[in-house]
Amino acid sequence: MTLPPAIPPTPADSMSVEEHMARSNLFTTLEDLTAWSRKHSLWPFNFGLSCCYVEQVTVLTPVYDQARFGAEVIRASPRQADLLVVSGTVFHKMAAPLLRLYEQMRAPRWVISMGACANSGGMYDIYSVVQGVDRFIPVDVYIPGCPPRPEAMLDALIMLQQQIGSERRPLGVTVGNTAGLGFDAPRRRDQRRDERMAQTLLDPPEKL
């Protein structure tokens, strides 16, 4: 019994310089490498306040496996996190602690607002509820729903990763005054508040 002849290795001299460099080296810019490492290594800090948090923690179960996106390391301290996920109803008494937690996070930092209550106050158009968490901290991704499904949280992570991958942030950035960045724009909800409060009759079902 004879063995088949071994395939001779390709001599290095027969490869072009471009082929040899492509097999042995990785060429990129420091900004692209930093963005790639950041988007695949998110350290979330969960701030759950209501029923949306139940759907949020479901993403950590094996059924959805958030670890696939490099965001499974839940941090107990905001000083070790770079992603803040706000889910649930944000009351005015919780706004100051939430802002303090955000300011303790290391830069660069990102924020996901999960659910209708965190996005715009939801159905609680009352004095004690903040009408959107973006009133006092910048938000990168909004997740609609009441409550949103766990798949929506995964979609938000993918959207955030795409956003981080295209960013050209410096290695360190300090978020200061947000005036002029779109966070202080008037909301249609507030513009029509007087009109809603003046209504005394409900619309019939056929007009809804």
Curated annotation (Swiss-Prot):
Q: rRNA-binding among the record's keywords?
A: no
Keywords, alphabetical: 4Fe-4S, Cell inner membrane, Cell membrane, Iron, Iron-sulfur, Membrane, Metal-binding, NAD, Quinone, Translocase, Transport, Ubiquinone
Listed cofactors:
[4Fe-4S] cluster
Biological processes, Gene Ontology terms: aerobic respiration; electron transport coupled proton transport
Segments crossing the lipid bilayer: none
Quote the catalytic activity from the record: a quinone + NADH + 5 H(+)(in) = a quinol + NAD(+) + 4 H(+)(out)
Q: How is the cofactor bound?
A: Binds 1 [4Fe-4S] cluster.
State where it is primarily located.
membrane
Does the record bear Metal-binding in its keywords? Answer: yes
Top-level enzyme category: translocase
Q: What is its EC number?
A: 7.1.1.-
Q: One GO CC term of this entry?
A: plasma membrane
Indicate how the chain sits in the lipid bilayer.
Peripheral membrane protein
Concerning PROSITE patterns, the annotation shows: COMPLEX1_20K
The region called Disordered is annotated at 182-208
Which Pfam families is this protein grouped with?
Answer: Oxidored_q6
Which SUPFAM superfamilies would you find in this protein's record?
A: HydA/Nqo6-like (SSF56770)
The protein's role, per its UniProt record? NDH-1 shuttles electrons from NADH, via FMN and iron-sulfur (Fe-S) centers, to quinones in the respiratory chain. The immediate electron acceptor for the enzyme in this species is believed to be ubiquinone. Couples the redox reaction to proton translocation (for every two electrons transferred, four hydrogen ions are translocated across the cytoplasmic membrane), and thus conserves the redox energy in a proton gradient.
Q: Which family does it belong to?
A: Belongs to the complex I 20 kDa subunit family.
What this protein is called in its record is: NADH-quinone oxidoreductase subunit B 1
| The encoding gene | nuoB1
